[in-house]
Amino acid sequence: VMSINIKRNQLKRVVIVGGGLGGLRLAEDLCNSNLQVVLIDKNNFHQFPPLIYQIASAGIDPSSISFPFRQIFRKRKNFYFRMAEARAVFPDKKILQTSIGKIEYDYLVFAAGTTTNFYGNANIEKWAIPMKTVSEAMGLRNAVLSNLERALTCATEEERQELLNVVIVGGGATGVEIAGALSEMKRYVIPYDYPDMDSSLMHIYLLEAGDRLLAGMSQDSSKKAYEFLTSMGVDVQFGKMVTDYKDHKVLMKDGQEIPTRTFLWVSGVKAQPITGIDGDHLGRGFRIVVDEFNRIPGMDGLFAIGDQCLQTADPAYPGGHPQLAQVAIQQAALLAKNIQKIAEGATDSQLKPFRYKNLGSMATIGRNKAVVELGKFHSQGFFAWVLWLVVHLRSILGVKNKVMVMLNWLWKYVSYNDSIRMITYATKPKEVRDRLKREQTTHLGTDLLENEE
């Protein structure tokens, strides 16, 4: 039987599931505490979500926004990282079951974020390209590039149009940003890389079910984003409910069809599920309901933060917080303090309840084109774009990466040139394939515990 292989010591153990922006911040803040910290993530690296779409359009290299956990936490005492998937929790036994065996905890924090929501549509789930992770973004990059290659050589005009149409479903920040990035690729890359192809044949459609883009931002930001995208040649359509995808066609409720082989679905998310936390504890979007201290009520030592949780105790956000990076980071910073107090035996009155401080929101649509809202201050265009760059560079982790990403962007800005338009697929050796297969079928929580040591 595999095991987590971490010795218990006299310190209380905090297990954190998920090394996104929230989980990472929590682990970092707890590293100097009097607790044993165990971080579990199914990847061995942290990925910086706001820039994932840049990989998809061959804008930056995946390694510029991915950071190995072991490197981040080098030389930390009482810190352990394990690459595994959380499967089930047994709150009464204080045990978390993972793909590599069980782990005991004193405190368990779920920070696993969200996954793409296909709303039960099997065809869309099978064919669409989601955009939540670095590997999905690389998949999209490969798809776009290999479709361009095929468009030069395919037999029929019909197939050529399918290969050159890109359909993006979902007009939130990700949809807007990827539409902008792909339209820049169409304008500045294709004429040079593919001189024998008519780039005007490439069409980018952005379909939104509602009546505006960036629903989380103000009306003027939505309007500006729409103007920017249409000026860049993106075909933005509102009131469009996508119902299915068949025979390389996106089908809509109103009967409209768009032929495409590059079909992106960024239309919604749902919280990562975990066995052992039943429906009574879940709110909308499958989010785990928590109290003002991010505790899961009625479950001793269990917490959830970030996109995965729904907290309605914040007076300014009675319906719960928006699923944004800042919420996760702020909740993590406060929970780190509260957990240390709880470990020392504090009562509720000694803990600080969470209040979200909205630092503003931003989206970038292309070079010189962004929308930024910081409180009463709204900006659109070049200044907003510079602000967007600064904010995202500041929050990126490693020093080397900040420099790399900045040089990359500056070079792109000056030259529109780009060296990462390679179609590369990672192959998995048989040993690794077999191991992954084994891990997918073991430790599902059903083999429970009684018969293990």
Regions found by a protein language model. Give the residues of each.
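A Rossmann-like FAD-binding core segment of flavoenzymes
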Residues: 77-90, 183-292, 296-298
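FAD-site-proximal beta/loop scaffold in flavoenzymes
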Residues: 126-156, 248-251, 257-330
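FAD-binding core/adjacent interface of flavoenzyme oxidoreductases
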Residues: 1-15, 79-167, 264
